Amino acid sequence: MKRKTIDIITLGCSKNLVDSEQLMRQLEEAGYDVTHDSEKPTGEIAVINTCGFIGDAKEESINMILEFAQEKEEGNLEKLFVMGCLSERYLKELAIEIPQVDKFYGKFNWKGLLQDLGKAYHEELHIERTLTTPKHYAYLKISEGCDRKCSYCAIPIITGRHVSRPIEEILDEVRYLVSNGVKEFQVIAQELTYYGVDLYKKQMLPELIERISEIPGVEWIRLHYAYPAHFPEELFRVMRERDNVCKYMDIALQHISDNMLQRMRRHVTKKETYRLIEQFRKEVPGIHLRTTLMVGHPGETEGDFEELKEFVRKVRFDRMGAFTYSEEEGTYAAANYEDSIPQELKQARLDELMAIQQGISTELSASKVGQKMKVIIDRIEGEYYIGRTEFDSPEVDPEVLIRCEGDNLMIGNFYQVQVIDSDEFDLFGEII
């Protein structure tokens, strides 16, 4: 009997990607062939793992569902299922509006999906995944949900309260992934620094990272999505002392004006934010900081925005992203503030802020010319090997381009590279 093929389409963040990888492993065990992120149906069944964070993400998810619903109507697909954050948040409404979908599931209801396919969920496979990333790196999700109640954010509504995974379970997953060739781990959570508070009654991120770093075969550990309030200072020591913990921190600061931080319900002040950045750079020499900022939140004055621009100029972040405020139903901001800043002004502020960062990024990249750096090779594109340094996370950060001239480099291996040139985003290097 011919094995059926299931297409898994993943939208949104890396946390969603981990969910898809776990589901793919279960489906393979159930006897299906599985593909990932096909633009058109390649099999009999499709599962779309949606994002519902902000307006643009919701629109992308709905458009993808409609495209596959049309394919089903045209006879190119037998079954269509939808899961993930958008489905969790609007399950009943979506089921009414898009009847071509056979069933919508909440974010965590994989067992229900497998059951409806007539298959069993294998508990013994709970730490196993079918990686969609290059085999040398993986995302490592250490918790679900978030207990922070930032004014603008719908994540706690969608995913619920913070739930930490047990340390031993995470370590077992790391060992499993290392045994399958993974060398580099992007440690992710909605809020890293809260890890352990629910389970162990104290912040346990420093201990967790230290224990991961002790596992043979773990070459790089990179941390994503920290929160500035109540930052666990013991982590500075771990990052400084452990060579395989990258000198890199992704910490979403959102704003610097005390007025905006209070309206955003961030529980941190301008003074505390500057102090934390100073601590990072003092305690972990050479650290590269990535942050995310928001413009256009209700109540943001020209003065607030000027403070934000001055903050970016003064701190000179190594990596920075920014986005405009999007009103999300059910949030504190939607209930208590009027979304009164015109979209045109939000976009103008975003463009102005990113232009400042663009100049900073160009200067910081140029300052690396002449340096020798450890680089991991991710792929080949045309006449270049494409790699990254410890200061660069996949998908979101700059890359290192090495011309394919006589050097037979292996994907997933580390090499010493001398930087010979740079542009606004990327570095150019040659093997030493």
Curated annotation (Swiss-Prot):
Catalysed reaction, written as an equation: L-aspartate(89)-[ribosomal protein uS12]-hydrogen + (sulfur carrier)-SH + AH2 + 2 S-adenosyl-L-methionine = 3-methylsulfanyl-L-aspartate(89)-[ribosomal protein uS12]-hydrogen + (sulfur carrier)-H + 5'-deoxyadenosine + L-methionine + A + S-adenosyl-L-homocysteine + 2 H(+)
Biological processes annotated in GO: tRNA modification
Domain MTTase N-terminal, residue spans: 4-122
Subcellular location: Cytoplasm
Record carries keyword tRNA-binding: no
Positions that bind [4Fe-4S] cluster 1: 13, 51, 85
Protein name, as recorded: Ribosomal protein uS12 methylthiotransferase RimO
Organism in which the protein naturally occurs: Bacteroides fragilis (strain ATCC 25285 / DSM 2151 / CCUG 4856 / JCM 11019 / LMG 10263 / NCTC 9343 / Onslow / VPI 2553 / EN-2)
Gene name, Swiss-Prot/TrEMBL: rimO
